[in-house]
A protein has these predicted regions:
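Extended recognition/assembly regions associated with phosphoester-bond processing machinery
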Residues: 1-211
Length: 211
């Protein structure tokens, strides 16, 4: 059968939810449900069909938004969030190759291309040297002779800020959430323009700053 590359983002472990412990707990629960599904530790409502799909996942790509550690966050909260992520990535990397991209809220440089997160954040997970990779944003890789190129979304968000692209421009074949239509429309335009970040460096920080 076919293989799947699983794309996921927005774990935002460490997010305080403006002091809302329930929101923080919900974020952790969602992340753990995802890990359990990918590693086969839990089943979904659809039963065998979903389990079969999970078994076909050959790589997980975490497209940014892994952490949301505020500058004014206390040490205990930050340390706890990093430990949670380390455990989560250890579970994933023990079952399937994982690429962790940097993103907008992650502790790395903000200009594109963003450098990989430092291995010191994930001492246990990075022991899986063959399956746990901390990678740049944008990130390109190949699976079974199929090439992938992706970002953590800053380029798409910036295009939407400074263009008239909106949900009505999305393809009629798009069957996803209506809230994602404008982003999908902007993403498809970057393919037509053959430019990953057309608004850089004017409104999206990048390096080098000029040709």
């Amino acid at each position: 059968g076919g293989k799947y590359v699983c794309l996921v983002s927005g774990f935002e472990i460490g997010k305080d939810g403006d002091g809302d412990d329930d929101e923080s707990a919900a974020a952790r629960a969602r992340a753990q449900m995802f890990v359990d599904y990918v590693t086969g530790a839990s089943t979904m409502d659809d039963g065998e069909a979903c389990d079969s799909d999970a078994a076909k996942i050959c790589r997980v790509v975490v497209a940014g938004g892994t952490m949301d550690l505020k500058a004014n966050g206390n040490e205990e909260t930050t340390s706890g969030a990093l430990k949670e992520l380390d455990v989560m990535f250890t579970e994933l990397a023990s079952a399937v190759p994982v690429d962790v991209m940097s993103g907008q809220t992650d502790p790395t440089n903000k200009a594109m291309p963003q450098q990989p997160l430092h291995p010191v954040y994930f001492p246990e997970a990075t022991r899986f040297e063959q399956t746990m990779r901390l990678v740049t944003n944008p990130h390109d890789f190949t699976v079974d002779h199929t090439s992938f190129l992706g970002t953590s979304g800053q380029n798409v968000q910036d295009v939407l800020k400074f263009s008239t692209i909106d949900a009505k421009d999305a393809s009629d074949t798009f069957a996803g959430d209506d809230a994602a239509k404008s982003s999908v429309a902007a993403l498809s335009q970057t393919l037509r323009w053959q430019h990953v970040a057309p608004s850089a460096p004017d409104t999206l920080a990048c390096y080098p700053f000029k040709d």
